[in-house]
């Protein structure tokens, strides 16, 4: 093979201070260098070294990158999204974290990777480094995740990946923006979120996933842990983790190490190592599970197995219109939202709706009431349209004393206009009259005192 003269482009990141976030700039330098292509391995005669400028820009700290103008990219194809499916094969420079970063803390750590909050010393920029265990993945899989994340970063609700990628002795690493409020899992309480917050989140996520689907990409691992929060009121959330992202139509295996409640039923039925066609309807299923999880704080079932999981069997009968009875764990939702769930959580993948279908239900009321799983709970429908219609009675059953339960019940009755004032003096007189007519063996003094205690 001969030598090929190419331009070496150094990606830059423009940091936006004051808004807690940053945006990527795809502009490149015009510095040229000679690159030699031997056996499809791209090597540059001029090493990529970390540099910074005084203009507020952070240049690639030891990053390997390929410009979209490089010959590895083709002219975009209107049918397949063009260059986004052409994953460049780039050699990652070898360095250590300490070369340019101060590790402030570990945000998360899993089987395959750990997430580190770091400060880039040359520019004093706070970034997040995703370090994937080199012995548990391949360089090709790492490059695919980094490439998809970077190419999708310009969408407002997809986490920005910087043009920074390198390897250490144990990890493959790339840099991302920092989400100050963590993931969605750490922001959802045991009873879920307000209906309005759920609508905000679902609208942003459907936009991000719809953008991916327009590029013929399927996320395949949609769950609350992969949604990052940038504002406390959920007006800005972003989709992350593209390790399982795949081009539509390819044959793939099941995603490992994910919640079984998020796995579509057609994938649960597969035998081990059996491959299946990757389709966007799997994201639609996971989006429906996500909606339920945000509203309630829990998944609707353990697994979408109608034989082993009774909760799913009940919903499947309702979804297929074999019964008109709404499953108990869905009774709090409005008919319009139930229609939405039917479309997203259809057992037959061919009947599932597109990911953007939720936009049709944004003006509808989603939650009519909440009911406790306790059989002794009382069902109350709200009358105030400005407050969330999520009300639980007896949600802390057994933790409150008898007096506290009485006071709590009186407050609720008074709120809904059901509290009737009682003349306690009249009650006492009637009790004494009743006691005076009792049997001669009845002790009026002792029993009347006991009765009065019960009334107070």
UniProtKB/Swiss-Prot annotation:
Coiled coil: none annotated. Expressed in the mushroom bodies (at protein level). Signal peptide: none annotated. The modification Phosphoserine is found at residue 334. Keywords: ATP-binding, Kinase, Magnesium, Metal-binding, Nucleotide-binding, Phosphoprotein, Serine/threonine-protein kinase, Transferase. Residues 15-78 are annotated as: Disordered. It catalyses: L-seryl-[protein] + ATP = O-phospho-L-seryl-[protein] + ADP + H(+); L-threonyl-[protein] + ATP = O-phospho-L-threonyl-[protein] + ADP + H(+). Its cofactor is Mg(2+). GO terms for biological process: long-term memory; medium-term memory; positive regulation of gene expression; short-term memory. This is Serine/threonine-protein kinase meng-po. The gene is meng.
């Amino acid at each position: 093979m001969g030598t090929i003269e190419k331009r070496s482009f150094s990606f830059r990141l423009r940091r936006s201070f004051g808004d807690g976030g940053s945006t990527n700039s795809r502009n490149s330098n015009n510095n040229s260098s000679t690159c030699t292509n031997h056996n499809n391995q791209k090597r540059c005669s001029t090493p990529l070294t970390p540099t910074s400028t005084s203009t507020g820009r952070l240049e690639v700290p030891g990053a390997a990158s390929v410009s979209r103008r490089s010959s590895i990219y083709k002219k975009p194809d209107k049918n397949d999204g063009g260059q986004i499916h052409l994953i460049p094969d780039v050699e990652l420079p070898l360095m250590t974290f300490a070369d340019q970063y101060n590790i402030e803390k570990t945000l998360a750590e899993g089987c395959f990777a750990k997430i580190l909050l770091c400060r880039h010393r040359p520019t004093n920029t706070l970034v997040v480094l995703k370090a994937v265990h080199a012995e548990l993945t391949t360089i090709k899989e790492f490059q695919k995740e980094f490439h998809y994340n970077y190419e999708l970063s310009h969408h407002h609700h997809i986490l920005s990946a910087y043009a920074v990628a390198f390897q250490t002795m144990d990890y493959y690493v790339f840099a991302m923006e920092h989400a100050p409020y963590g993931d969605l899992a750490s922001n959802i309480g045991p009873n879920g979120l307000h209906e309005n917050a759920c609508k905000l989140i679902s609208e942003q996520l459907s936009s991000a996933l719809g953008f991916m689907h327009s590029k013929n990409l399927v996320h395949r691992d949609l769950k609350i842990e992969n949604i990052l929060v940038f504002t406390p009121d959920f007006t800005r959330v972003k989709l992350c983790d593209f390790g399982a992202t795949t081009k539509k139509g390819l044959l793939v295996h099941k995603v490992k190490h994910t919640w079984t409640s998020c796995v579509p039923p057609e994938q649960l039925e597969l035998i081990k190592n059996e491959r299946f066609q990757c389709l966007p309807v799997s994201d639609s299923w996971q989006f429906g599970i996500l909606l339920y999880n945000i509203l309630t704080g829990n998944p609707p079932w353990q697994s979408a197995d109608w034989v082993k999981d009774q909760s799913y069997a009940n919903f499947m009968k309702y979804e297929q219109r074999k019964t008109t009875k709404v499953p108990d764990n869905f009774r709090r939702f409005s008919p319009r939202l139930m229609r939405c769930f039917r479309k997203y959580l259809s057992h037959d993948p061919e009947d599932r709706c597109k990911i953007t279908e939720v936009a049709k239900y944004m003006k509808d009321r989603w939650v009519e009431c909440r009911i406790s799983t306790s059989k002794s709970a009382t069902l109350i429908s709200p009358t105030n349209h400005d407050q969330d219609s999520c009300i639980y009675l007896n949600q802390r059953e057994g933790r409150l004393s008898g007096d506290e339960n009485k006071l709590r019940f009186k407050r609720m009755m008074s709120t809904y206009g059901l509290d009737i004032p009682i003349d306690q003096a009249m009650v006492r007189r009637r009790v004494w009259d009743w006691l005076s007519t009792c049997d001669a063996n009845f002790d009026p003094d002792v029993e009347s005192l006991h009765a009065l205690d019960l009334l107070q």
